[in-house]
């Protein structure tokens, strides 16, 4: 019995460990792992296939080849367990030990570990403070290094060439030591005094001034401290003993025909052993130095190749000319251990097949072919057959199943009942790519899928395949049913809108049945209820579309569940009455009393979910689908060539356009317009022509004139099939119909420019050869784009998941009072996103007050649902402060209140929800729909003329924000501030429109004036930038000398002369240092001050400024003194689509970014250099002056003497997110990234909730840079996790010490993933070698907090249902630590016990942890 128990023991090793530590292993440690030294390069005997003794597969070292059998066959059987055979020396045990027993090689000469040498920055190099090149020259025997200087002039670590060494030998004899090779480096590493060096460097750091030196010191300090903390010894970076992988992990398999298939590692090990043995022999023979050296170098190279082939020099190749796969290659990359086997595994109990439509299924069902079911449920069937007594043994059951007897099918039916299966379609881009269904057995071999879940899977039935998985355990079945059932996933986790929305045929059917027709059969009939209407339709008394009156009963259910009914006669159509029969009670008839396109159906389902709950919605969705299919069939909608009606007006429009083009061509030939202007005009003409044709076509298609019952003509919505499909949203769009029946329009050349002659034909008329050829380019580009897009989008998703995977809801409420202010998003005259959309499902951070009173509408910590949003709208509230993940205070995760509503469920989010992964999937999944290209501004795109006025759309009141203005002589306001915004508010004070107003704009209306819709409120000259005077007086020119700093120009047409200031480059040497300016003086010639200050009114003039006034002329307030011409800003390519999203999340700095003011203060210009000017800001609060060099070609927005606030734009351009964070703070950068990302998705019509993007931004803001360390143990210039900084500061403040000063850093997602605390997660993401090297040197411990690390070590993840498991485990650990201590002990004893308990915990972790 004991033996049996022992047998079971090794398999059941407890996985109770709390972390995994990675460290350098010492030679002794490697020897302790080993079961013996491998002395020979032989593998197995080619005749007997038995492993050679002392070879790479030796049974004595690694264990027996057959279970419980020694090699020579003396001991067989279980009874000899643990005996070591005296003849062949093999222990009698399981073969399995050959997977875990390691061997070793004693190296004849030490060898450097290539990872610590070559992985940048070189750890050995940093340790010794030598360059990598020098160390390599020593290691590969090209030069000597001094290991012991003695009393000579030679320094330790000095590099000597062969000749220098010989000279030194002559001079000093044996007073010094110099060696080459790894021994030398080993001696140097041994000599490093870590504690002393750390002390020295810490003292040096504050005293060094040069930036580079400080960086170098802090790098070295970090490394030394890592060694100090981790108890690694530097000399362990040099190998003296090489471990050998267990043989079953590098198998050698005999193939038929006497050949062997082998792992590359065996070849690499053989090289090492061969060279090592040869070196041993040479040393024994006392061979000449040069030969020994060469052999040592070869050994070093062999070990390098084994550890990381190709890292240094050329990769060693095998017989077939491909590089051998080394140990490093085994773990990195997509095919490496991490990503291939640990993060993604193949599973059993699965099958795959093609999918087809299951229009008769319920939403929670799927059709499973009998063959597949039989195979998947085999074990269940065997068990059931035995329990029934139909089969006596498993074998008999197996026979029955193979014969497929009748009982087997009966049993299968029972087994399948209520046992959900999982269906998955690749690529699984979001969590709805795997859902659970109840199987229904079907004939045939294809899986049947419910049409409504196709949208979630992004599946269609053109040959897609899906995989079926079977949840086995009870818990798995329970989770599948409660969490993954398709009926539980009605809402999309990305936007919170229903994702189970009918499309295509169903939409067409519903649209058809709810259309109305004038003068249909039975028009004007009256029915007592919808049932009667249906009877009349079925008996042919009434047409489906006829306008009739029906008595309809509406039921409304309020919050408490009370029902109120209302019955009245309604004007409707027969079809709508029939549709109302399947409406669940509680939904108003209004919802369907219209032509039901895709959008109204979506709204209806959304309302059903919010008002009636999940169950009714699911039943309703199914009913809608069945009805839709039926009436789509009845409608007989089909497409014939005659349905594509070409508008009459097309000929005229096209010929008119051709005439215009001919006219422009004439103008071009006579030299009136340039080629560029001609090109733009021609393209303009054709674009408008195309618009006209398509408008004419749609008008023609969408309406038809019919006779009504009085015989008069009346127009109604058309019943044209093509139009119905597009109008209902079932398939197609006006743009596509335009190509079928309008004209194809302008096409692009391969270089992206637009061809001047459009394709005038459409598909109905047919294309000629040239037209066809032109259009092939676009089509091919589309295909190439799609392929690229898929890969790029997948990679973006992977980076997003990796950065956000450990964001999990950890607690209910972190109690923070921080949050983000939310306003409606307004661009120009349009509300892009109303407040309601932005705050729905968020939690309030501050109570909302009723406008104009002290009354509290909604208290703090309210979750805003639909009803609350109605309250906000009724009280016309414009700005709300809500909680956000970005400002959440929870360490290691976020709290439920800061996240708000779980979008996929519609209630407050649960603890343990993996919101990070959901966010990443929601952003990544639509990635394939985004465009790939950057738009080149050319042709039709650059038609937008420069804006020169603001015309409001709605009536309302004007408000100006951060504006300064003066009133000029015409009583108009002239703006004299930079970043002014003008908003229009309605009568409730809600913002409706928002515009930017430039400096120098003239406002007809001022602050608080009311305007009518369509009124123009501001004008400015878009081509010049004025300089406005804020005081009146006479002007006086200073340093304006004709021919030195300015020239006069006379306009040919008007004869007026103007003064143009020369740029510094064009001036003579005399004028280089002059500063031309205009001063204002009063009648007596004294300087005038700007009102309310003692700053004299003087305006410096930059180069190219134009002055139309003469010296000493009078000016009034608000007059223009000078104008600076604005050259049209360089046409930049607009980056759009996927690359733009990637740029934002990677926080890339744009080319030529906007320059922002670093401080608040007064601007002045210092001495200029050749290509740059010096901008100085003198702070208002009297701090240090800030200076910045700005290239001259940048157009500046500020003049000398102007006030700027911190973060204000000084030179236009795309803003860099890092600058925004530094100068305007966290919420500004969050807003910027959220809005910019949303803009890209909005263009494609994809709806994503803001909080997903915020979750990613939170992860990008995880790190802080330490500016001053204070009294904490942080290093300045170091990047540290925010939570760590806050903890250190809290500790310092509690002890009354100085806290550290830090600044938040914004990291791109790749960099953020690589700098996570967990090295396992980082290593499995990218740059595996670098991450592992760094972690090993620092002796890092991974405490397995995130999801990825736990998947890799094979545990439940700390999210979802695994969250409670981890919580309980933590609690148990705490209890265990608290239980052992009896209060009777002394303090010392207690401490000892606690230490023992902790050590016991650690040592048990040590056994399992991967050292």
From Swiss-Prot:
Single Gene Ontology MF annotation: magnesium ion binding
Cofactor note text: Binds 1 Mg(2+) ion per subunit. Binds 2 Zn(2+) ions per subunit.
Listed EC numbers: 2.7.7.6
Coiled-coil region: none
Enzyme class, spelled out: transferase
Top-rank taxon, per record: Bacteria
Protein name: DNA-directed RNA polymerase subunit beta'
Residues engaged in binding Mg(2+): 460, 462, 464
Catalysed transformations (reactions): RNA(n) + a ribonucleoside 5'-triphosphate = RNA(n+1) + diphosphate
Name of the gene: rpoC
Keyword Transit peptide belongs to the record: no
Keywords: DNA-directed RNA polymerase, Magnesium, Metal-binding, Nucleotidyltransferase, Transcription, Transferase, Zinc
Binding-site residues, Zn(2+) 1: 70, 72, 85, 88
Binding site for Zn(2+) 2: 814, 888, 895, 898
A biological process term (GO) from this entry: DNA-templated transcription
Quaternary data: The RNAP catalytic core consists of 2 alpha, 1 beta, 1 beta' and 1 omega subunit. When a sigma factor is associated with the core the holoenzyme is formed, which can initiate transcription.
GO CC terms in record: DNA-directed RNA polymerase complex
Gene3D superfamilies: 1.10.132.30, 1.10.150.390, 1.10.1790.20, 1.10.40.90, 2.40.40.20, 2.40.50.100, RNA polymerase II, clamp domain, RNA polymerase Rpb1, domain 3
Pfam families per record: RNA_pol_Rpb1_1, RNA_pol_Rpb1_2, RNA_pol_Rpb1_3, RNA_pol_Rpb1_4, RNA_pol_Rpb1_5
Annotated function: DNA-dependent RNA polymerase catalyzes the transcription of DNA into RNA using the four ribonucleoside triphosphates as substrates.
Family note: Belongs to the RNA polymerase beta' chain family.
Annotated InterPro entries: DNA-dir_RpoC_beta_prime, DNA-dir_RpoC_beta_prime_bact, RNA_pol_asu, RNA_pol_N, RNA_pol_Rpb1_1, RNA_pol_Rpb1_3, RNA_pol_Rpb1_3_sf, RNA_pol_Rpb1_4
Organism the protein comes from: Idiomarina loihiensis (strain ATCC BAA-735 / DSM 15497 / L2-TR)
Cofactors (names): Mg(2+); Zn(2+)
